[in-house]
């Protein structure tokens, strides 16, 4: 029988489950929910009297329920950490002073409008897919720009400005799916939730939002994160 909610929460975080379910597109097609933690089918037959190896115990088997978690930890979390650690090192713990490139602003506006249209049609699966595609592209942009800017403070500030603009957009759009992690990012960026997650401010970058709140980029203090901080934490049962 299907696991109860209480049982699921013994192996997965609410954020992981919500992101997975929203991505399945259950309103469009029939998809099975197959969390590895509850899969008791045989992965490998035991030999010489040894017990069979079940899927739930086989480290070689990828957990379908954690597919979206790879995006949260490998793309989204990395982007947030890159921005905050980068600003701590290069901007004195404040926002970058550069204006984002127009192509960065255009890309953000495009995904915002696409997401809003899809959400209006209750197409959560496609809306999250649009954010995923956008976030991966912006993460790649940041990786290339930050690498090219090594040793050039002005170019690095510009790369950070682009990344911060994208980070705000990603965090706003992912908030309905993973609110806890997104609100933790807003806290680290030192913005009130009611302003940061307001759709009235959706087309504002962090620098513009700070200005609305009466601060310049140089005045807006960011949180100093400890090393290797995770905004999207794994369930204790998933840690090696």
Language model: regions and residue ranges:
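Core structural elements
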Residues: 74-82, 129-141
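Basic, alpha-helical terminal appendages of large translation-related enzymes
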Residues: 132-240
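Residue-level signal for cytosolic alpha-helical hairpin/rod architecture
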Residues: 2, 108-113
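Short, hydrophobic/aromatic alpha-helical segments in well-folded domains
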Residues: 4, 114, 169-173
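Secondary-structure capping and boundary motifs in well-ordered enzyme cores
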Residues: 8-13, 42, 60-75, 100-108, ...
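Catalytic adenosine-cofactor/nucleotide-binding cores of aminoacyl-tRNA synthetases and other
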Residues: 1-99, 202-204, 210-211
